[in-house]
Amino acid sequence: MIISLLHLNLNAQVFNFTSEEEGKSITHKVLLDSEYFIETQYVTDSNEFISTRGGFYELKEGMYLVRFEFNSNFSSDSLKTLNYKSTKWKQSKALKQDHSGKWLMAGRVRNGVEKRRTTSGARKTLKFLLDGHFQWTAFNTETFKFHGSGGGTYTAQEGDYIETITYFSRDNSRVGAVLPFRYDLKGMDWHHQGMNSKGKPMYEIWTKRVN
């Protein structure tokens, strides 16, 4: 299968385009850096989540071969790879922020006690941040089981990190919610504190992905 892209600069970028399916306008949002690619689809009018898929890619003969780490529709389409080439997408305005890059959930702090978890196993939670846009996805690289995803826009400045939810696979009623957090960058780690989408306190530790 081949899906279109045109003249993608290998710097971190965010793209959007729309398609029509069964009379509905579908928004496709693409997060792309020099090695990793995510495409997410949601209904344009309601922001209802449809699907997401992503993974590392390589450029071969003008085509982007994406080898998926996750595919929310894997149980129905069994896709593990996809080729992208040649068409024009609309690039979002670049808004450089702290945190840009790929992060893996590395642990939590509860009652003042830090508990780490491995980031090298098959079960991962990835957060991809580019140009003021974010997406987190929970998945298993071995079984392709999809555990959920959400994304939108964010700002990060002087310890304040604020997310605005555009799509959320688990609960569409959370679309539009604004979630304020505090952050602290410590070496390769991002300490992330506040209230989660259910209004419960959380303290997460994310670590910069290096592979």
Question: How would you describe each model-predicted region?
Answer:
Residues L8-S149, I162-N211:
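Lipid interaction determinants
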Residues M1-H7:
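Bacterial N-terminal signal peptides
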Residues G151-A156:
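Beta-propeller blade signature
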